[in-house]
């Protein structure tokens, strides 16, 4: 059986890691042992933050909606409750975009939702 030398394989692996570490600071970009750790940690952060991104954007949409709805005399929580009662099934992202780019349409949605709320005494 022929002898297997791993020079080509390990060189390719090292190249792959160093390519991923491109742009890192200090020895993290050119020392394989340190670069490997840095790339691994970077991938962990990327995985974690793909999940966090969803939370962050939802929070942003809610903040925007809260600000937009308060201009119409409601709070965010009462607005969402009113939407549910009036049977309007539009997600927070779409409502947020509507509030920014189509204020008139958003105002109509708010008025429709307000009509589902009980009148204050």
Curated annotation (Swiss-Prot):
PROSITE patterns noted in UniProt: RIBOSOMAL_L20
Keyword RNA-binding assigned: yes
Record's keyword terms, sorted: Ribonucleoprotein, Ribosomal protein, RNA-binding, rRNA-binding
InterPro entries named among the record's database cross-references: Ribosomal_bL20, RIBOSOMAL_L20_CS, Ribosomal_protein_bL20_C
One of the Pfam families matching this protein, by short name: Ribosomal_L20
NCBIfam families given in the database record: rplT_bact
Protein name: Large ribosomal subunit protein bL20
Source organism per UniProt: Methylorubrum populi (strain ATCC BAA-705 / NCIMB 13946 / BJ001)
């Amino acid at each position: 059986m022929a002898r297997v030398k791993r020079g080509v394989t390990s060189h390719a692996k090292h190249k792959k890691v160093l390519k991923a570490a491109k742009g890192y600071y200090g020895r993290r970009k050119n020392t394989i042992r340190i670069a490997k750790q840095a790339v691994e940690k970077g991938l962990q952060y990327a995985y974690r933050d793909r999940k966090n991104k969803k939370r962050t954007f939802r929070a942003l949409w809610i903040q925007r909606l809260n600000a937009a709805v308060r201009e119409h005399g409601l709070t965010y929580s009462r607005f969402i409750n009113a939407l549910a009662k009036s049977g309007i099934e539009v997600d927070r992202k779409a409502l947020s975009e509507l509030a920014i780019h189509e204020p008139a349409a958003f105002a109509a949605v708010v008025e429709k939702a307000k009509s589902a709320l009980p009148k204050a005494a």
